[in-house]
Regions:
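Sequence/structural signature of long amphipathic alpha-helices
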Residues: 1-160
C-alpha cells in the first residue's frame, strides 16, 4: 500500500517523502475520480445523481488539499535550500491547513458512504468503498506526518 510506504519514509524525516506524498495523493485522487466516473457512466448504477453530488463535495475539499500539499512541498524544498523563519512559519501554517482539510475530506467520505449505503443492495459499490478506504488511510498517514513535521519545527524553534 502506498500510504504505508509514505509513513515509513515520513518517519525517517526525509524530504523525498514529501515528493512521494504529493505523487501518491495525485494518484489516489485520479483513481478515485476514475472509479466514480466509471460508476456514474454505468447504466446499471441506480445512484448516478448521488455520485455526482458526492464527487462535487469531494472536489470542494480535495482540490484545495492538493494545492496546499503542493505548496507545502515547494516550501519544504525551499527550507532545505535556505532555512528561514518565514518559511518555517509557512510550513507550520500549511501543515495545519492540510490536517484540517484531510479531516474535512474524511467527513465528506463518511457522509458519502452513508448516502450510498441504500444502493449497496442493488449495485456493487466495492470499488468506490476501496478507493475511499485507500484515501482515508493516506489521510491518516499524511496527517500524522504533517503533525510530526509541525511539532518537530515548533520544538526546534522553541529550543527543545
Amino acid at each position: 500500500m502506498r500510504a504505508r510506504t509514505i509513513k515509513r519514509i515520513i518517519n525517517q524525516s526525509h524530504t523525498d517523502a514529501y515528493d512521494l506524498m504529493l505523487e501518491t495523493w495525485q494518484a489516489l485522487d485520479k483513481d478515485f475520480a476514475q472509479v466514480i466516473g466509471d460508476a456514474m457512466h454505468d447504466d446499471e448504477c441506480p445512484a448516478t445523481m448521488e455520485l455526482a453530488d458526492f464527487f462535487d463535495e469531494y472536489a470542494e475539499v480535495a482540490y484545495p488539499l492538493a494545492s496546499n500539499i503542493k505548496c507545502f512541498v515547494r516550501t519544504a524544498h525551499a527550507v532545505l535550500e535556505n532555512p528561514n523563519d518565514s518559511d518555517f512559519n509557512k510550513i507550520v501554517a500549511l501543515t495545519d491547513i492540510c490536517i484540517e482539510l484531510g479531516q474535512d475530506l474524511d467527513g465528506v467520505f463518511l457522509d458519502g458512504l452513508n448516502m450510498l449505503k441504500p444502493y449497496a443492495q442493488q449495485y456493487d459499490l466495492s470499488s468506490i468503498a476501496n478507493a475511499i478506504r485507500d484515501i482515508r488511510e493516506f489521510i491518516l498517514v499524511m496527517n500524522d506526518g504533517f503533525a510530526k513535521t509541525r511539532d518537530g519545527i515548533n520544538a526546534v524553534r522553541g529550543g527543545e
